[in-house]
């Protein structure tokens, strides 16, 4: 069965390269530009994993993760932060809120793919 991923990031170049890479890995890919868009998609789709930026307009990644973790139907969905926020305190906060992994930008697409595959297979 095809795995589903929701990519949440406000940087179009990042979204495009990740979307392409995950489609090549036979993922069904959903895209949101911020947390509120992501939460809207999550009302209709239950992805295997959400790849989530933190610094976004409207609803940020921390708020989005909190809402995801409050939703019972998403309890099996893995959430991975992919963000430029790389201080120890940022990482600690992300993991305390319930992220399954915390990855930082800049990144290698190959590494992101392998980290995600490790979580969902």
Which residues does each PLM region occupy?
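Acidic, metal-coordinating helix/loop segments flanking the phosphotransfer/catalytic sites
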Residues: 31-49
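Two-component/phosphorelay signaling modules centered on CheY-like receiver
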Residues: 12-30, 119
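Receiver (REC) domain active-site loop signature in two-component systems and cognate sites
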Residues: 56
């Amino acid at each position: 069965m095809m795995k589903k991923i929701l990519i949440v990031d406000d940087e179009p170049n990042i979204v495009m390269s990740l979307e392409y890479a995950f489609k090549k890995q036979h993922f069904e890919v959903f895209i949101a530009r911020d947390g509120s868009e992501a939460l809207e998609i999550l009302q209709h789709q239950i992805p295997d994993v959400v790849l989530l930026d933190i610094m976004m307009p409207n609803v940020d990644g921390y708020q989005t993760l909190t809402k995801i973790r409050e939703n019972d139907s998403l309890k099996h969905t893995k959430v991975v932060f992919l963000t430029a926020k790389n201080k120890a305190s940022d990482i600690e906060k992300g993991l305390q809120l319930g992220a399954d992994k915390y990855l930082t930008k800049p990144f290698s697409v190959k590494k992101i793919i392998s980290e995600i595959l490790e979580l969902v297979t």
